[in-house]
């Protein structure tokens, strides 16, 4: 009987330890800003095999830039930018002032991760914790983060649309992506892609955990 109990405990303990460790990381990774009371977890969905083959390299450079928790966001960006099939998979050449498709695959991922990290840092410095500002800025450039910082500090489609309208001088082009067709009949302003957040987020499942929920799960796990 005692041996059976030991075996049961030995089986359950690693699982409980993993739960405690996971949620402990969530809490420790909280932003210092007390207004940000949620811990987002990003999981990828419907990513193609061509994109997933780049995951090890994305993980490597995400880790180097301190953004490992955003690996699935970066993979979703690759899905939108190139489907994982172009050489410059993250289309990050232009963030270096280079012509499009100037970088090799590894150079593209290295620069894409570095650029994303710089945008994330810039947004946090401006008091913004909305990941969608970072995502849209990856497409528009850092000027969009400045624009949002002066207009509520939270991304919205209307802000993305108005930013593109101003930058394009109001010039519209046909855009037949299903998301655009559903939203406005199939057009966008001729500057970047005002639907970029929607395009990326269709490949993400974003869950929010409140501090209270995380703590409750940890307390329950520790009972055992």
Enumerate the predicted regions with their spans:
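Non-catalytic cell-wall polysaccharide-engagement segments
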Residues: 2-51, 99-110, 114, 118-223
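Short, charged helix-capping/linker segments at alpha-helix termini
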Residues: 62-71, 126
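Glycine-rich, acidic and aromatic/proline-enriched surface loops and short helix-turn segments
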Residues: 76-85, 140-143, 223
């Amino acid at each position: 009987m005692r041996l059976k109990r030991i075996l049961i405990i030995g089986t359950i303990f690693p699982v409980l330890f993993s739960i405690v460790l996971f949620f402990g990381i969530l809490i420790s990774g909280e932003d210092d800003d007390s207004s940000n009371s949620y811990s987002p977890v990003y999981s990828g969905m419907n990513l193609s095999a061509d994109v997933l083959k780049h995951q090890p390299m994305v993980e490597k450079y995400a880790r180097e830039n301190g953004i490992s928790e955003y690996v699935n966001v970066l993979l979703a960006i690759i899905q939108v930018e190139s489907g994982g099939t172009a050489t410059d998979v993250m289309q990050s050449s232009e963030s270096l002032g280079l012509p499009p498709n100037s970088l090799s695959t590894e150079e593209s991922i290295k620069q894409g991760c570095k650029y994303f990290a710089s945008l994330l840092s810039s947004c946090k410095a401006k008091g913004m914790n909305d990941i969608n500002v970072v995502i849209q800025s990856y497409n528009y450039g850092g000027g969009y983060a400045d624009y949002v910082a002066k207009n509520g500090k939270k991304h919205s489609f209307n802000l993305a649309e108005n930013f593109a309208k101003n930058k394009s001088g109001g010039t519209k082009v046909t855009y037949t992506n299903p998301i655009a067709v559903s939203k406005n009949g199939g057009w966008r302003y001729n500057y970047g892609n005002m639907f970029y957040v929607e395009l990326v987020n269709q490949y993400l499942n974003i869950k929010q955990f409140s501090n209270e929920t995380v703590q409750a799960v940890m307390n329950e796990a520790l009972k055992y």
